[in-house]
Amino acid sequence: MAYTGIDHFIARMRFRAAYPHIRPGSRVCDLGCGLEAAFLDYASDRIGMGVGLDDQVADGMQGRWQRVRGDLRSPLPFPDGNFDHVVMLAVLEHLTEPEKVLSEAYRVIASQGSLILTWPSAMVDPILNTLHALHLISDEMESDEHQKRIPVEALQQMLQRIGFQKFLHRRFEVGLNNLMVAFR
């Protein structure tokens, strides 16, 4: 099923939550960027250099952005400290080994850089299942595609073990989604 208008609306809400945390002129890696690397386009006025990595994209340039076909279960194909920000919007809930992926994200973030995450709260699952049953959202938005939920406190502890120092967390979309910014 192709992305629907509701899918795009929900994605834009995530983009709006993440956007203020991108420093102007920064180097950004969007892990799990999707076919269109849409967040890089959305935040283009703040991004000096952008790379989108996803297992569904073809390697090459997409406008100003480099697309890299890659699997998040493998080591990231980037040098240590290469990015000011790593963005993972609605990706965490799909990972079977989140600590491994988050450790790799930490490795490629420069000193004073940040990891910007969004993920849905458990309250959203019945809503997603209903929207999916009505064919109003794509298959990958359905809650059956999601792994075990990580509570905010457990995620923060995991990120501290990895090496992140400071955290900003807030809920958005009337509490149905979370934003966390973790700083190196």
Describe each region flagged by the PLM.
Residues 116-138:
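Conserved class I S-adenosyl-L-methionine
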Residues 27, 112-114:
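Short glycine-centered segments of the SAM/dcSAM-binding site in methyltransferase folds
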Residues 99-111:
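A short glycine-rich, Lys/Arg-flanked "PGG" loop and its adjoining helix->strand segment in the class I
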Residues 1-79, 85, 102, 142-148, ...:
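Conserved N-terminal segment of class I S-adenosyl-L-methionine
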Residues 88-91:
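A short beta-strand submotif of the Rossmann-like class I SAM-dependent methyltransferase core
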Residues 59, 112, 123-125:
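Feature marks short, surface-exposed loop/turn motifs that line or immediately flank catalytic pockets
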Residues 94:
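Histidine-centered divalent metal-coordination motifs
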Residues 158-164:
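A structural motif corresponding to the C-terminal end of an alpha-helix
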